[in-house]
Amino acid sequence: MSSRADGAVTTVGTVRVIVTGGGTGGHVYPALTTVNALREALAEQGRELEVVWVGARGKLEERVAGQAGIEFLPVATGKLRRAKNPLGMLTWTNIKDLARVPWGALQSVAIVRKRKPDVVVGFGGYVAVPVSVAAWLCRRPLVIHEQTVRLGLANRLLARMAKSTTVSSPSTLDLLPGRARKRAEVVGNPIRAELFGGDPGRAIAALALTGFDRNLPTVYVTGGAQGARQINNLVTDDLPWLLKQANVIHQCGATEITRVRETADQLSPDLKQHYHLAEFIGTELPDVFALADLVIARSGAGTISELAALGKPAILIPLASAAGSEQAFNARYLDENGAAKALLGEVTPADLRAAIATLLDTPAARTQMASNARTLGKPAAAQSLAALILRTAQ
């Protein structure tokens, strides 16, 4: 045992970290991946990680932390629902939520004072605000991470307080305040290590894709874990044409499975054997990615980071209502760098068909897109971020 300068008694070699952030998978899973990378890095040094996750009760972060065996502490928080007209934000729901923030800040200060972390790491989302402010008030080093190309509102506020701001894309640096920019580092967006171990043969076996024609390319269609009606509609409207060009694995989401299956049931047997419909792709995802020659997806921060790191050619259809149109910014960033094709605005089945045809008919175009994606991808992002956090904690 040893005593730190602040009076906290700690096991020799133990690093104390408070992780905060949540609300969506885009914040939660990079945080979890980073915690795992921290544990691995410290284990190699014969040291240990003492970590607590501070988030909102009943949200995704509480469930994920519990499943990973990470201690979880809830604090009150509120969400600011944005509107094009600033007056539109003066709603009772916004006012009620924002009134919870001071209480959340007091809770967070109490947690930081009691735990005396070596470093606090924020991954965005509104719950990260009170905890990060508490770190600043208690003079604990704060590291924040931005997953999106366009700087999120929470991190825009916190960047001035952070000892280090880490971002996923060089394009984000110019959006930071001047002083924060000098303390910023591009590390990429941490993605799950298991995604890099995919095997096409395992996907065929696990999903029983015995009818797939291996002479055809494979297209993976996904709207994320919940599915996306817009993408489902675009694909099913032209499904017979698509199945003449490719095998298709289609993750449509639980709420859409019945409707999409009705469309699939109308396919001729020779086309239907090239089509695999699922409401969710779980543990098979690394293998599905390995099998896919082309991915059709949304453009959330996690998705584009995975596609880039894996070097997967993609057609991106952003969620128009994403906060601050961040998905459109993400998609445009990859498109401008030749790493994906972005379909923006009102997308029609004809638009999607043209984009698919160009990439399926021209293997060289897919190869070049994959190469461009890998150039943007940072597969060691979790390790880079973990190393920075440990340097900050010293």
Regions flagged by a language model, labelled:
Residues 117-119, 289-303:
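Acidic donor-binding loop of glycosyltransferase active sites
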Residues 2-58:
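N-terminal subdomain of nucleotide-sugar transferases
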Residues 107-120, 127-143, 156-164:
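Glycosyltransferases and closely related glycan-assembly transferases
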Residues 19, 136-201:
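Active-site-proximal region of nucleotide-activated glycan assembly enzymes
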Residues 48, 64, 83, 200-295, ...:
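Donor-nucleotide binding loops and adjacent catalytic segments primarily
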Residues 365-379:
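A short, well-ordered alpha-helix in the C-terminal region of glycosyltransferases
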Residues 378-394:
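C-terminal alpha-helical cap of glycosyltransferases
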Residues 17-22, 43, 47-100, 187-189, ...:
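Conserved nucleotide-sugar phosphate-binding/catalytic loop shared by glycosyltransferases and other
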